[in-house]
Structures are given as structure tokens and as C-alpha cells.
Amino acid sequence: DAVSITSSSDAAELFGDLPLSSDRPDFWNRTFSEASGFIGKSPEEQLPVRKKLISILIGRDGRMEPLAQKYFSLESLIRIQQREIGTGFIGGKAVGMLLARNILSQEDHEFYAKRFVPHDSFYLGADVYYTYIVQNGLWNLRLLQKTKEGYYKYARELHEKILTGRFPHEIREQFRYVLEYFGQSPIIVRSSSL
């Protein structure tokens, strides 16, 4: 008999390691593919690779970088990228959530193991926003709105045009994948950009 899985924690346990399609032969995927070759090597050999991945995925924030270096393994950085829609930084909320989980897991594993279910997150890369703005012909309007004089003057027009834009086909396909992945399970979307 087939059993329907409706619990998000059960779904995370079964499918949490499934990556998004990564058949794009670009700098981003080549970088992470090459980084995969360092899995199993010594921490000293992994260090420059981890630093590079942290700088392009997590960010170069002065306060966050040392914590990321301490608590993100090479494997965990590659797993983040495998579940990222688009490319680029994953954003502060996602970084904070992942960092907090890693700190708890590494500093008090017994506490963590008893109280936390596996997380089952996907991440939206920063390039998705910029691609959306450019593909919908909004770049110049965004630049005008970012000025002191244009902040309020162009805000409504930019807002309305953003609401009527479309994502590129590849991004829409990745969104579909995520929705199909979760099926009927409830999802939470966290973003200050929405």
C-alpha cells in the first residue's frame, strides 16, 4: 500500500537531500562542482575553497564571516547551493537560520538532536531579484527610485510594475519544482524582498 506523506518533517527526512537541477554550465555551477572535489580532503586543503564559497554564497559581512568559517562545512555549503533557486547570496534570514542550526548542532549536539527536526529549505539567490528587474525592463526605473529625489516619486510606479512582471522560464521551472517537491505540505516563504 502507498502511504501519503503529509508531515513536513517526514518529507524532509525522505527527500531533504534532493538537489535542484544543476545542469547550467556556468561559473557558479563550475565553482561548486570543483569544490565537491575537495570533500574528504583535509581541513587545510578545504579552507581556501570554503572561504571562496562563503564569500559568494553567504557573504563577506565582517561579523558573519568568522562565524560562517567556523560553523559551515564544505559539505553544508554545497548542500545550500544544491537547493538554491538562481545564484548568489542567499540572504541574511536564511544565513541566520542555517548558522543558528549549525551552532546548536555543533556546540550541543545532544540538545539539538532531541529538539530539532530536519530542515527542508530552498533558498532564493540574489540574482533572481536583479534578473526579474532587468527582464521586465525595470532597471532604469529602479535606479531612479533609489535616488533621494526619486525614492517616493517613483515608488508607486515601480511597485505596480513589479507586481505585473514575469520571471524567466528557468526560474519559473525551479519554482514549480519546489512546489511539486512539497506537494500538499504547507510551506513558509521568508523574504524581506517580497
Residue ranges of predicted features:
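N-terminal beta-alpha lobe that positions the nucleotide/phosphoryl donor
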Residues: D1-L194
